[in-house]
Design a protein with these regions (language model features):
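Active-site segment of extracytoplasmic enzymes that catalyze sulfate/phosphate-ester chemistry
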Residues: 35-126, 146, 150, 156, ...
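Low-complexity, glycine/alanine/valine/leucine- and proline-rich hydrophobic stretches
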Residues: 410-425
């Protein structure tokens, strides 16, 4: 079976005939898109026909996990194939929260010593491009120094000042997103990032390319074209007014339970249109037979906040909590891979993580694996080609920080169907069987103490292995 897969990949990536060029890769990263925020993953409120069609063409991962519940750490794992705790990038860069513990220190940039996935493709003769959100360091650590020959609308900011041109906010370095050449007043950022990406694909149509389109959407501020918002306003009105019953408490925070935010829905629609335009350009250029498209989010949807504002972006039900938390709502996310030659319409249920994309994309492209670099990732190529997945393995999370969502310093491990969450303030922990309790409502610590002890021991062993920084008493 392995030989069959290798032969298929060789046909695609290297070519057994002159007419088979190397595989192009388009990696589309969405910011804060929740697990159930698209039609193919179960939403009935958001409309995502192009994303749904992409999944129908390829593989949909139903148990994909982001490496962190916040953006910068997950993005670091995508670029390196390493766990954020190993890189010591465990918080969103710039994040600071006060609490009972002194939060752990963390790195504020992606080290240049890492061989990024951009460098891996560039060093194999690919044209490389990075468009959109970076959030992995300031000047001196930007993507043009990390393997990407072409970049656009990239800086250290985690969100724009506005999604309508001009995008930057000179009064806040966190939202200082540069404008694009050719912008007109009111240009919508999601559309413009797509325009630039299409130009990159067009320019490099006759050579192998690796493009990362990293949308700022659907991160706050929640803004979208008025006519699209109006349509979803009507759709939300049909659901009836939002009330206290559509929220539940999560410790000191509040979690939204119903998808009904019209502006957020309009932002998702714009992102879906971006995916459709990318796929159509690839088809128009006649390169679809040697171009893979990967669609992924960097963490769960923003459903949980400290303040009860009735303005959370989305709901992740049946998952618990959202962005910032190590419950499923914060770390389970969509992943779709459409690769030429792979079976269409696959639903892959094996637990996987952001760290896996680096070796996966190398193998799909027929490039040499770099196991000393992607230490914490395993290739999913066999699963994508319908030939079995990786062996069962534990997945780990480490978040030694406080977050505006209400989460506190914590760690987690999933091993098989069992998942344990450890709270660093008081040393408490919770155990859930995800096969029977996806919403993490029934804590099994009292019923299965041996399993809890086994998972806790493995989580603590792993933290020692990767040198994870811990919070300290004040």
């Amino acid at each position: 079976m392995k030989k069959t897969l290798l032969f298929a990949l060789a046909l695609i990536a290297v070519g057994c005939a002159e007419s088979t060029p190397p595989l192009n890769v388009v990696l589309i990263v969405i910011d804060d898109l929740g697990w159930i925020d698209t039609g193919v993953y179960g939403s009935s409120f958001y409309e995502t026909p192009h994303i749904d069609q992409l999944a129908a063409r390829g593989a949909r991962f139903s148990q994909f996990y982001t490496a962190s519940a916040v953006c910068s750490p997950t993005r670091a794992s995508l670029m390196t194939g390493k766990h954020p705790a190993r890189l010591d990038i465990t918080n969103w860069i710039g994040g600071e929260q006060n609490g009972l513990l002194q939060q752990a220190t963390y790195e504020r940039q992606l080290p240049l010593e890492e061989t990024t996935i951009g460098e891996a493709f560039r060093d194999n003769g690919y044209a490389t491009g990075y468009v959109g959100k970076w959030h992995l360091g300031r000047e001196g650590f930007m993507p043009e120094l990390q393997g990407f020959d072409f970049t656009a609308t990239v800086n250290h900011a985690g969100q724009p000042g506005s999604y309508f041109s001009p995008y930057g906010n000179e009064n806040s370095p966190r939202t200082a997103v540069p404008d694009l050449e050719g912008d007109s007043a009111g240009s919508y950022l999601t559309d413009r990032l797509t325009d630039v990406s299409l130009d990159f694909i067009e320019r490099n149509r006759d050579q192998p390319f690796f493009l990362t389109l990293s949308h700022y959407s659907v991160h706050t501020p929640l803004q979208a074209p008025e006519e699209t918002v109006a349509r979803y306003d009507r759709k939300a009105a049909a659901l009836g007014p939002e009330t206290e019953e559509h929220y539940e408490s999560e410790r000191d925070a509040s979690t939204k339970l119903r998808q009904d935010h019209a502006t957020y829905a309009a932002m998702i629609e714009s992102t879906d249109e971006s995916v459709g335009r990318i796929v159509e350009k690839i088809r128009e250029l006649g390169i679809e037979e040697h171009t893979a498209v990967v669609f992924v989010s960097d963490n769960g949807g923003l459903s949980t906040l400290m303040r009860r504002s009735f303005n959370q972006a989305t709901a992740n039900m049946p998952l618990r909590a959202g962005k910032g938390w190590l419950y499923e709502g914060g770390i389970r996310a969509p992943l779709i891979v459409a690769a030429p030659g792979a079976p269409a319409g696959l639903d892959i249920a094996q637990p996987t993580t952001s760290n896996d994309l680096y070796p996966t994309l190398l193998e799909l492209a027929g490039l040499t694996q770099m196991p000393e670099q992607h230490l914490d990732g395993e290739s999913l190529a066999s699963a994508i080609f319908g030939q079995g997945g990786t062996a069962e393995r534990p997945l780990y999370w480490h978040f030694p920080h406080y977050h505006g969502s209400g989460n506190r310093p914590s760690g987690a491990i999933r091993w098989g169907d069992l998942k344990l969450i450890e709270w660093f303030e008081d040393g408490g922990f919770e155990l859930y069987d995800l096969s029977a309790d996806l919403g993490e409502r029934r804590d099994l610590v009292g019923e299965r103490p041996e399993d809890a002890a086994r998972l806790l021991s493995e989580l603590q062993r792993w933290r020692g292995e990767v040198g994870a920084n811990m919070p300290t008493p004040r």
